[in-house]
Amino acid sequence: MTEFINRLQKVASNPNAFKKTGRGIERETLRFTLGASLSTKPHPEGVGSALTHKYITTDFAESLLEFITPVSNDVDTVLKQLEDVHHYTVSHMGDEKLWPLSMPCFVTHDDDITLAQYGESNVGKLKTTYREGLKRRYGSVMQVISGVHFNFSFSTEFWDELFGEQSEDQRKESVSDAYFALIRNYYRFGWLIPYFFGASPALCSSFIQGRETSMDFESLGKTYYLPYATSLRLSDLGYTNDAQSNLKISLNSVNEYVDGLNKAIRTPSEEFAKIGLKEGDKHIQLNSNVLQIENELYAPIRPKRVTKSGERPSEALERDGVEYIEVRSLDVNPYSPIGVNEDQVRFLDMFLTWTVLSDSAPMNDSEMACWKDNWNKIIEKGRKPGLELKIGCQGERLTQKAWAERVFEDLLVIAKEMDRVNGDDAYQQTHKRLSAMIDDPELTISGRLLAETKAAGGIGVIGCKLAVEHRETHLAHQYRFYTKQELDAEVERSVQAQKEIEANDKLSFSEYLEEYFSYLK
């Protein structure tokens, strides 16, 4: 019996180990107009304050909505919550629509994009100034790429069965070590996510206007594509930061990770210093370090803990260890009105369980570089027949198909255990549908989307068509989890909360920044 099977049987002996898994979803999407251009309207007034609303906020831009679900133990519940919040928002958007693709179209210049606005409070101004810094550092067009983030935590019962009886400190350390083991395996095998669910094989030419690229694109009118690509969003064309590539933050323990993060937020950048901190009285970045704040660190997966008021993410991790992980490699699923579907959630349940129960040796920088090379191959040519990937850095290779099949043998064992606990076959059905995609890459989201793009004559055409269909779906939706009254009440609460924050400010913005960044001294 393998160690993996042994560990799986341990945790599966308690039905609640899987039943109490925690899941939350964050979905980003751009508002755009009937004339197929980016919305220039402010955040819809009817959905409340973007600063304080629990479920409806904005990301980088005023037009870039972000929908957030609370933590749920049930797959159906988290999707119902997302559907309800989409319906409520679209009902307050007039004739504007939600862009259904990760990669933006119709955006040609940074100045087309209004930064997200959060009111007159110091915390609101800090959020907008941070975004101004991102704009000056990397450009706005790159920042309006949309994604889906999946937050995931194992249950207390899961850890109880896996680790047995422990003191509080021992448990904290064991759980953090297990989550970092998961993260290392995610880098080793997470390329399966863009293979199955990558949804950006093509992009509008406006996105790369004036940008250098070494990619050998084929064109179709104003659409550029790579014939076997899965997720150009995750490629060098997407969110990249050369300054960050030298940070080398360790994933071998929570202490090493926090040390690396603390160093990054204190490392000055000559390049960013040239931008300056102010133009007249206006702050244009929070500081000129490699990272303005910890959230600027780009990563396909992050260890997380809910922060207390005024606490930085690294301080929360240092205080009590890892509480959950945030998967950040999902493109927006264009075929789902809410950008993600049940199969994706169930796959991540199985895959993340497999990554935590499988062996996971410590990882050095050179090994990480080898695994990242596999990701890049899948991102740029993942559907190419016979594509070979590295097995670590030892020179051995295996076809992507053979490797996926090996992983799926283990995932089937997990699927059966999860279904046994739930009394149905939902995980095995997901496994079956995804197995078909291993055999036929054209069944993947990127394969399907590229075929439809070619048939329609361009990615923009597909985006507009799906946006109209999804808008009709959202408007016709009947509430399945929340009530209209509950969401109305949250709007009122959020507006009031913003007013209170603004009324309670005592410091000038400059004084507030001085105090906020006192930890850098």
Swiss-Prot record:
Recorded metabolic or biological pathway in which this protein acts: Sulfur metabolism; glutathione biosynthesis; glutathione from L-cysteine and L-glutamate: step 1/2
Q: Which GO terms of the cellular component aspect does the record hold?
A: cytosol
Q: Write down the EC number.
A: 6.3.2.2
Which keywords accompany this UniProt record? ATP-binding, Glutathione biosynthesis, Ligase, Nucleotide-binding
Q: What class of enzyme is it?
A: ligase
ATP-binding keyword on record:
yes
Q: Name any one GO molecular function.
A: metal ion binding
Q: Which InterPro entries match?
A: Gln_synth/guanido_kin_cat_dom (IPR014746), Glu_cys_ligase (IPR007370), Glut_cys_ligase (IPR006334)
Its BP terms in the Gene Ontology are:
glutathione biosynthetic process
Which catalytic reaction applies to this protein?
L-cysteine + L-glutamate + ATP = gamma-L-glutamyl-L-cysteine + ADP + phosphate + H(+)
Q: Which Gene3D superfamilies match?
A: 3.30.590.20
Tell whether Cell membrane is among the UniProt keywords: no
User: What PANTHER family does its record include?
Assistant: GLUTAMATE--CYSTEINE LIGASE (PTHR38761:SF1)
UniProt family annotation: Belongs to the glutamate--cysteine ligase type 1 family. Type 1 subfamily.
What is the official name of this protein in its record? Glutamate--cysteine ligase
Instruction: Name its species.
Output: Aliivibrio fischeri (strain ATCC 700601 / ES114)
